Amino acid sequence: MPKIAVLPGDGIGQEIIPQAVRVLKAVLAETDAEFEFQDYPIGGAAIELVGKALPDETLQGCREADAVLLGAVGGHQWDHLPASERPETAALLGLRKGLNFYANIRPVRMIPSLLATSTLKENVLDGVDMVVIRELTGGVYFGEKGRSDNPRSAYDKMTYSEEEIRRILIQGFETAMLRSKKLCSVDKANVLETSRLWREIANELAKEYPEVELTHMYVDNAAMQLVRNPKQFDVIVTENMFGDILTDLASMLGGSIGMLSSASLSGTQGMYEPAHGSAPDIAGKNLANPLATILSAALMLRYSFGMEAEALRIESAVEKVLEQGYRTGDLAQAGDKVVGTIEMGDAVLAAL
């Protein structure tokens, strides 16, 4: 029986994960598939429970699972801890490294009924449909770092191996093959040696994918182009820090970061989570938007279990709910039906 490790985490994670699980169970109930759902603590909740953000039991449970569904981690009450012990570092980076989730996939699509929610013009956004692929376990976030005194200074080392670059670029090419056969590799090869190696390997791999149109773009230009003309992009592939920044920027192309789903893949497993954080300011108030988490559950069915029809059912239900005018506060405009977290989950279930 396939096993899903469920990690609600902190803040609104405790509210949005139950809605995604409800939707998953409803869809799976109409198939012959039987799944086991097992909850584990992570993040600040785990610190309070056992004294560490990523308990051994949680890491082992995730290793034994076929897929991981994660809510969000972090909160101001743990900011006093050393950086290496905070939920965002110890839990998220530890999980990514421990399970070798090296590829982060974030679909960005403007749903027509949400065009008015973005700060960008409708003619710029209408038709936006792209995938951003971010390398997740290398680069400056995982490099050697430190500080010295007299005078005070700090350093963070960025390193990439050929293997790390090659495997994420292959993910980019393979994804492009399934879509419009257009791949934009984003780097900073005019300044960074790691980016020059990245570009070399991308050009080498392009010979193995002659059907894919490969282009290169510097990250600063990519940020500008995502706002100026986002429809030029179909698949973007980039390194860890650049991807971290660009995916948050791209989230506004879909109306709200509350709509941005995410899949993190290894060769054998997947972890699925919304792109937003734990939002402690609205936690426990039934205000959080669960749609990114529900859409992440759809990605789980697609990537980890090959259940494309069921994934499409969830995505269609989300679109239907939005077309009916249901909105959580982050998406609300005048005249919309503003609902809470639970009510939005109810609406998606009804739309199924």
Swiss-Prot record:
Mg(2+) binds at residues 220, 244, 248. The record marks 141, 188 as: Important for catalysis. One of its GO terms (biological process) is L-leucine biosynthetic process. GO terms for cellular component: cytosol. Its cofactor is Mg(2+); Mn(2+). NAD(+) binds at residues 277-289. Its EC number is 1.1.1.85. It is found in: Cytoplasm. It comes from the Bacteria. PROSITE patterns: IDH_IMDH. GO terms for molecular function: 3-isopropylmalate dehydrogenase activity; magnesium ion binding; NAD binding. Pathway: Amino-acid biosynthesis; L-leucine biosynthesis; L-leucine from 3-methyl-2-oxobutanoate: step 3/4. Binds 1 Mg(2+) or Mn(2+) ion per subunit. Catalyzes the oxidation of 3-carboxy-2-hydroxy-4-methylpentanoate (3-isopropylmalate) to 3-carboxy-4-methyl-2-oxopentanoate. The product decarboxylates to 4-methyl-2 oxopentanoate. Homodimer. This is 3-isopropylmalate dehydrogenase. It comes from Desulfitobacterium hafniense (strain Y51).
